[in-house]
Amino acid sequence: MNLKEFSKRIGINPSTISRALNDYPDISQKTKDTILKLAKKHSYKPNLSAQSIGSIKSKTSFKVLIADKISDASFKIFKDNNILIDKKYNLTEDQILSIISNYDGIVVRSSTKVTKKIIEKSNRLKVIARAGVGVDNVDVVTATNRGIIVMNSPQSTSRTTAEHAISLVFSLARKIPFAHHSTIQKKWEKELFKGIELKSKTIGLVGCGNIGSEVARIAKSLEMNVMVYDPFLSAEKIESLDAEKSSLDEVLKHSDFVSLHLPLTINTKNIINLKQIKKMKKTSYLVNAARGGLINENDLHIALKNKLITGAALDVFESEPLKNSLLHSLDNIILTPHLGASTTEAQ
């Protein structure tokens, strides 16, 4: 049984399985234990990498391709560990295929896709590092099956992305972008842009990992009620967040704001569609600063056009950059160009 088959059988995304079995610190011990038990039950024997971060750093001949722009401060880390780097940005898949055999590692952000073809092309590749949280632009299944470590930086952008999600909540509640657009046209439409307070409102989090937890903490500081749908969240974590763990249906039904904080997997793609949106209150708002593809954008267009919910704010899209989308025609949506991790501190 390979990783993909095991993932489908137990209903847990491959990235979480891989990180749990490689004992990554961002995966809770409870989740690790659960996955280990399921692996034993289903006779799944992962091809775990024998590489360790220590052994990687000790190799003076270790060479890494930096395929997307990262902070200049990051280069000192490579230098201090005698790791050679090549900075080559905006490469096509074919261009990467032609050079990937020269590298032990590759560093990407969200633009570059590390595909199955790229991974299988090189027998030298040992590490794929994603400078950010999500790894949906990396074929984790193929990498894991070949014993290649897939790394990310789950804590690095958590606060930044959480703040952006909350900023979108504020913007919807107080209609700030719409009021700005009106005012620069020399209009003065105070009554049109009357908003709502966030205090005592309920925010429902669909997914509550590092970023979702930060959103929960900020929301509680605003005296909001927090509901959470996350099958993998422990009772201890829920208690520490002072949140209420609920089903997806209950979160959609009772929340004033629904905010998504999930990875994009075969199980989460289009998790929010027209059927789910119809369960939400007509006065509610939908926010996605996680991954494009979690929301069916055509269904969202229908819902907003027909006022099934009051509004939405999206920072991520199924296809980026966003071009020729039906969402552009709506006057009750806020769109930002994937700014979640775009702060000086996070970079």
Q: Whereabouts are the PLM-identified features?
A:
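Phosphate-binding beta-alpha-beta segment of Rossmann-like dinucleotide-binding domains, i.e.
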Residues: 146, 154-202, 217
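An anion/phosphate-binding loop that grips the pyrophosphate of nucleotide cofactors and donors
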Residues: 103, 122, 254-255, 283
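Short acidic active-site motifs
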Residues: 92-96, 113-117, 247-250, 272-275, ...
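An N-terminal-biased, well-structured beta-alpha scaffold segment characteristic
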Residues: 59-151, 273
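Rossmann-like dinucleotide-binding domain for NAD(H)/NADP(H)
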Residues: 146, 150-151, 283-347
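Short glycine-/small-residue-rich Rossmann-like dinucleotide-binding loops
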Residues: 22, 50, 111, 133, ...
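Rossmann-like dinucleotide/phosphate-binding beta-alpha-beta segment
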Residues: 191-282
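N-terminal helix-turn-helix DNA-binding module of bacterial transcription factors
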Residues: 1-54
